[in-house]
């Protein structure tokens, strides 16, 4: 049976400042940790990325032409405050005013994120969000943006608090490149959630007319063997690291006994302790019912089995299928069932996981209000032929995920929109330019845009709300 989505559903496209803008040192923009980290550790940089800094009118015109009525944009913190605080960079402020005006001119609603992996270098080098001073700097930055940009109707504080901590302190593929430090992972999650809560409370106290929420990456975790208690426990602990800890902070205003017991077990196996303060929970409690929406980024699920050995994580950054490895002491090991497809980067394709995660939020956190799927898409080594890409695999991937959204809505979940990652091809943090996600192919040499087959398909779905 053909499935449909509501008439008022937003069909969006997602971007991020550092992955799209380029112009990393232009017009007074301050440095971010990624600038030097990429030069030192990778075979690419974020210059010029998709040159969105100069070509956003082209991308927004394409968005309008192809039925995309919402766009995720992030503000580069160091474009506004080059060192994270203090002196304002007027040219950076002007750029975002112009960008938001172009969005509205093209009838593409901007959903604006304050922090998308790009803390200014001056703050990152003094501990990033492990340093509580930077909570204050973030709240001040948020306050400035809320006041300066009244044309923004939808704000999100952070993009993917979970993967920031994981990338920086567990996998070690994000600056500062620390591996296997679970205490730092949880402390980063916690301090960022406190920053989120304080920004949300400030926004509501000031009486701004828009909406505010947070974007969490929520990969669903399953036990490899549902009958094996050790596998079930491995999935529970993995879920706490990536999902439950931050969801509890967002919607409970504290960590449940089960969550805290899991954290204690993880730290007992891996070492370290957390600094959780009374004033932190006061802030979390004050904001738990103030979130207007939850953004869910969903790409994949994971299956976990029990594991007794030492921690080892190997990141598949070059699309060599089967080269990744993920096992954590005291938690478990990721093992993909044979029947589940995966991408060249070992990302498991499992649309049911999105449905299960949405229904989990609905059940466990009934104060969630509404959900947007703020990222979902297929990374692919696109083949450019006849001035396009025949990306049937991407179409199939998105179609399957839209279908489970239709199911979730039918089953009572309040899902209001979907943002494909990504609007156009952008630079990928730990994969460079080979891994493409866009509806529009970008020739990174010429910066020309070309609609892929998926862009034409997405336009039809957006216009009809029929998933076909």
Swiss-Prot record:
The active site is at residues 160, 375. The keyword Protein biosynthesis does not apply. InterPro entries: 6P-beta-galactosidase, Glyco_hydro_1, Glyco_hydro_1_AS, Glyco_hydro_1_N_CS, Glycoside_hydrolase_SF. GO terms for cellular component: cytosol. GO terms for molecular function: 6-phospho-beta-galactosidase activity; beta-glucosidase activity. D-galactose 6-phosphate binds at residues 19, 116, 159-160, 297, 428-429, 435, 437. Pfam families: Glyco_hydro_1 (PF00232). It catalyses: a 6-phospho-beta-D-galactoside + H2O = D-galactose 6-phosphate + an alcohol. Pathway: Carbohydrate metabolism; lactose degradation; D-galactose 6-phosphate and beta-D-glucose from lactose 6-phosphate: step 1/1. Keywords: Glycosidase, Hydrolase. The keyword Hydrolase applies. PANTHER family: GLYCOSYL HYDROLASE, LP05116P. NCBIfam families: lacG, PRK13511.1. Belongs to the glycosyl hydrolase 1 family. This is 6-phospho-beta-galactosidase. The gene is lacG.
């Amino acid at each position: 049976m053909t499935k449909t989505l509501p008439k008022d559903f937003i069909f969006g496209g997602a971007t991020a400042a550092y992955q799209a803008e380029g112009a990393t040192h232009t017009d007074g923009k301050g440095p971010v940790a990624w600038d030097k980290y990429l030069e030192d550790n990778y075979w690419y940089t974020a210059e010029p990325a998709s040159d969105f800094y100069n070509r956003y009118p082209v991308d927004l015109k394409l968005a309008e032409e192809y039925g995309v009525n919402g766009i995720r944009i992030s503000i580069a913190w160091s474009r506004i405050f080059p060192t994270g605080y203090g002196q304002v960079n007027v040219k950076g402020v002007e750029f975002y005013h112009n960008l938001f005006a172009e969005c509205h001119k093209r009838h593409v609603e901007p959903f604006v994120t304050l922090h998308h992996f790009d803390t200014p270098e001056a703050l990152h080098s003094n501990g990033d969000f492990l340093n509580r001073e930077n909570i204050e700097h973030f709240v001040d930055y948020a306050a400035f943006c809320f006041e300066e940009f009244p044309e923004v109707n939808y704000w999100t504080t952070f993009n993917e608090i979970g993967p920031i901590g994981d990338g920086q302190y567990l996998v070690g593929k994000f600056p500062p490149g620390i591996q296997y430090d679970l205490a730092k992972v949880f402390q980063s999650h916690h301090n960022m959630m406190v920053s989120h809560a304080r920004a949300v409370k400030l926004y509501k106290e000031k009486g701004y007319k828009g909406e505010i929420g947070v974007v969490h990456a929520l990969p669903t975790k399953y036990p490899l063997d549902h009958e094996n208690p050790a596998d079930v426990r491995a999935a529970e602990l993995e879920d706490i690291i990536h999902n439950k800890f931050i969801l509890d902070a967002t919607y409970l205003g504290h960590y449940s006994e089960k969550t805290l017991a899991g954290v204690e077990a993880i730290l007992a196996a891996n070492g370290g302790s957390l600094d959780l303060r009374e004033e932190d929970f006061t802030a979390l409690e004050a904001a738990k019912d103030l979130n207007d929406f939850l953004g869910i980024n969903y790409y994949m699920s994971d299956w976990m089995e029990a594991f007794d050995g030492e921690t080892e994580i190997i990141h598949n950054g070059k699309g060599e299928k089967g080269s990744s490895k993920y096992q954590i002491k005291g938690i478990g090991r990721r093992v993909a069932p044979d029947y589940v497809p995966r991408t060249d980067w070992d990302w498991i394709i499992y649309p049911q996981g999105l449905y299960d995660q949405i229904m989990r939020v609905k059940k466990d956190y009934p104060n969630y209000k509404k959900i947007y799927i703020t990222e979902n898409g297929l990374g692919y080594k696109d083949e450019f032929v006849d001035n396009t890409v025949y990306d049937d695999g991407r179409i199939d991937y998105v179609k399957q995920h839209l279908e489970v959204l239709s199911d979730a809505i039918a089953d009572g979940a309040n899902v209001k929109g979907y943002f494909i990652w990504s609007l156009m091809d952008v630079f990928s943090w730990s994969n460079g330019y080979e891994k493409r996600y866009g509806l529009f192919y970008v020739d990174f040499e010429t910066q020309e845009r070309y609609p892929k087959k998926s862009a034409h398909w997405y336009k039809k779905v957006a216009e009809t709300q029929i998933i076909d």
